[in-house]
Amino acid sequence: MEITLFDPIDAHLHVREGVLLKAVLKYSSEPFSAAVIMPNLSKPLIDTQITLEYEGEILKNSSNFKPLMSLYFNDGLTLEELQHAKHQGIKFLKLYPKGMTTNAQNGTSDLLGEKTLEILEDAQKLGFILCIHAEQAGFCLDKEFLCHSVLETFAHSFPKLKIIIEHLSDWRSIALIEKHDNLYATLTLHHISMTLDDLLGGSLNPHCFCKPLIKTQKDQERLLSLALKAHPKISFGSDSAPHVISKKHSANIPAGIFSAPILLPALCELFEKHNALENLQAFISDNAKKIYTLDNLPSKKVRLSKKPFIVPTHTLCLNEKIAILREGETLSWNIQEIA
């Protein structure tokens, strides 16, 4: 059995920087045609110049791959800066509520504040797409749900602004997407295939710790259903977020799952299991092209066959190891050719 996927797109990706970028980028740039690149670096991408420099680093270390750059939402985004960014081909803004995830200490503290709404008004006029880490302070399993009132306000106040709920994790958010024409979402492999049991049902597994948290079986099943039918308002976004093992095994574990090396084989396995392989092309590419109005992307064909793929236990960054999701397991699908 074989399947060929055309122009895979990862609508939410972390490729880090420096030597770590050089170690992990290939796992995304080789099989994927394009990816929406997250801006929460140690030095966040708060303006056009910094963002273009980072884009250059990605392009220097990849080929036949389009990084779709995003700006870190901040109070310094004047109308002039947004116009400059748009002129340079940047079409995404990423809003992080302050402190909700990795490198979000510079995030937005008042999501409904006057300055935030002013920037969103400008973004709407210029045709930006707003990607939001949709969590609010509260009990860890309810943080996405607690952000619903903010999402509703944004959707009503800016009806022409496309708003993406990144890494949808709570089944209660599905109703919002179906209610509001301008609300969309991305789904990760881990949120549609894993639950809290994978994180802490046995021994604590730090390599399954992410934000937003993987949640209950009900959440996983409802989200998987969206993916399997390739809901037209949903696109795939891996949120692949590598950390070296020494940090993942520390007392202060950073959130992030490194899934990039297994994404396409694991998705094939999952969709075949549920008799939905015919919908994988839409989930992995076609929906994103429509939602984000993407064209002129690098052409890519990825042929996968039903042959065993043993997931490596790790990859290397200098002398440090980076653990890979489902390390050591055997997947039933494997990439045979990328053209």
Swiss-Prot record:
Q: Cofactor: bound how, per the entry note?
A: Binds 2 Zn(2+) ions per subunit.
Binding residue positions for Zn(2+) 1: H12, H14, K94, D239
What positions does the entry give for substrate binding?
H14, V15, R16, N40, H133, H243, A255
Query: Per the record, GO CC terms?
Result: cytosol
Q: Annotated Gene Ontology MF terms?
A: dihydroorotase activity; zinc ion binding
Keywords, A to Z, come to: Hydrolase, Metal-binding, Pyrimidine biosynthesis, Zinc
**Reaction(s) catalysed (UniProt annotation):** (S)-dihydroorotate + H2O = N-carbamoyl-L-aspartate + H(+)
What are the positions of the active site? D239
* This protein's pathway: Pyrimidine metabolism; UMP biosynthesis via de novo pathway; (S)-dihydroorotate from bicarbonate: step 3/3
Looking up Gene3D superfamilies in the UniProt record yields: Metal-dependent hydrolases
UniProt-listed NCBIfam families: pyrC_dimer
Q: Which family does it belong to?
A: Belongs to the metallo-dependent hydrolases superfamily. DHOase family. Class II DHOase subfamily.
Query: Under which name does UniProt file this protein?
Result: Dihydroorotase
Question: Per UniProt, what is the name of the gene that codes for the protein in this document?
Answer: pyrC
